[in-house]
Amino acid sequence: MAKKIIKSCYIWDELLMAECDRLPAVAERASRVHSLIVSYNLINKLQVVHSSPALYEDLKLFHSENYLEHLKTLQKVDDDYVIEIHDEEFGIGYDCQPVSDMYKLVSVIAGGSLAAAKSIILGIADVAINWFGGWHHAQRFCAEGFCYVNDIVICIEKLRLKFKKVLYIDLDVHHGNGVQDAYNLSNSVFTLSIHKYEPGFYPGTGSMDEVGNLTGKGYTCNVPLHESYNDETMEYVFGKVFHKIYDSFKPDTIVVQCGADALAGDPMGGGGLTIKGYCTCVKNILDKQKPTVLLGGGGYNFSNTAKLWASITALVVDVELEQNIPEHDYWPLYGPDYIISIQPLLGRDKNCKADLDNCIAKIEDNLKFVIERKTIKHKTEQNEISTCKNLKETLCKRQKKLQIKENNVLIIDESPNNDVYNFID
C-alpha cells in the first residue's frame, strides 16, 4: 500500500489545558506536554482545533444523569471540604478527589475528545490527537482511578454516527476497564488492552478470560503481562495480536489510548517500555491508513510523559526530533541530560515467550466469534445509542460552521443550533 499523506489535527485550547492542569493526580502535566510539543515546532505541522465544553446530552451518551447531577453539586471545594457518603457512592473520594467546579471540568475534558471525533467525521483530519483525553477507568455511574469522565466512550459514540465498526486499543499500563465494561455486550466496538496484570495491581481486571458476553463474545481482547515488560515483549505481542484482530474485525476507524505509565521509570506503572516500544505500536496502527484518534491517559513521570507524546506527535507528522530538548519554560525539569530519549529499565523482563505464545493462541481462538458473526448496532444499557438518520445528507445540508483563524487554528462551532448531528432518542 502506497504511503498516504496524513492530514492531522491537534486538539488544544487554553481552557482545555487549564482544566486538565487542575486534575489532582496530574496537576500541570497538560501544560508541560503542550510546551514540549510547541518547543519542537510541531504545531506548525498540525491543524490546531479548539474544542468547547461537551453538552449535557453528549455526557449522557455514557454517564448516568444521577452521576452528572451530583458532579454539579461540587462547586466550591476547599481544604475544609469533608467527603460524604453520597460523594463516595459516585466514586468521589480516595483516588478521585473532589475538585471545585467538577461539572465544568468533566464537560471540558469530554469536549476535547468530542472535537477529535468530529474532526475525523468531518474529514478535517485522518489522525486527530488529543493528549488531554484518555480517561479510561471512569464508569457510567461513578468516577474511578483518577478518571472523572470517560471521554473515550463518548468519543467512540460520536464516531459511531458515521463509522459502523470501531477498534479501541489501550496501551496504558493499567487495564482499560471502563471502556471494556461499556462495550462488553457490543460486537460493533472491539476493545484491545495490553497491560500489566499482577495480584494487587489496579484495577485487578483484564485477564485473558474476559472476552465479552452474549453478542459481544469475542469482541474483547486482553493481553495481560507481568511487570517490567520491555519493548521487545510489547512489539512482539502487539505485532502478532493487532494484525490478527484488524484482519478479523475490519474496523472502519481506530481509537488509541496512549497512556504513558508503561514507560520505564513511571512511579505508578511497573512497565519497562521506552519511546520506541510505543511508537512501534502506533506506527503499525497508522500504517493501516484508517481514521484514527490518539488520546492520552496515564503517565505520572510528567517529563517522560511529555517526551512520549511529543515523540508520537512527531511520528504522525513525519518529523525526526532532535535529541537535545529545546529550551522552553519547562526545560529545567528535563535534567540532568535534557534529551528526548528515555533510558530502558535495567531489570529483567518477567515475561517468557512461551506464555506470550499461549496468550496469542487463545486470542486467535476467540477471534473465531468475530469471523463468524455479522456486526450489528449495539444498544447500551442506558439508552438507545443516538444515531443519525442520514449523516451524509445532514453534512451536505447543514455544514458545520468553521472559522479559520491565523496560525492554522480551527474552531469548531459547538452551538446547538449549528450542530451538524441530529440525535434521536
Where are these regions (language model features)?
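A general "terminal functional-core" signal
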Residues: 1-11, 16-17, 70-425
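N-terminal low-complexity, Ser/Thr- and acidic-residue-enriched intrinsically disordered segments
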Residues: 1-66, 77
